């Protein structure tokens, strides 16, 4: 059995689906899952009581609304939303996010 890790191509993985707001698991490590997602339009206001949430923008622009303002993320930027903090991600055009 080969134990050499194989690189994961984000482009190839994104080519496998077109659905919006439907994260796809592309890798797992310990207790973590790495998910790719296509985002366009507005999501609902929500929070995560048990875990932080990370957004890494690979392509496009992602806006994340908070109760006291909005953060704009461009390709190559990352944001960690602390657990329990209400937020709403949105994108006026498709953004590809890890």
Regions found by a protein language model. Give the residues of each.
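Short, charged/polar surface micro-motifs in flexible loops or helix N-caps
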Residues: 31-33, 40-42, 61-63, 70
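Short acidic-glycine-tyrosine-enriched beta hairpin
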Residues: 67-83
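A cytosolic small-molecule/anion-sensing beta-strand core signal
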Residues: 30, 58-59, 74-75, 93
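Conserved short histidine dyad/triad with adjacent acidic residue
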Residues: 19-20, 33-49
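Ligand-binding loop in jelly-roll beta-barrel domains
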Residues: 83-98
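Short, conserved beta-strand element in jelly-roll/cupin
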Residues: 38-40, 48-65
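A short, N-terminal "cap"/entry segment at the start of jelly-roll beta-barrel domains
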Residues: 1-35
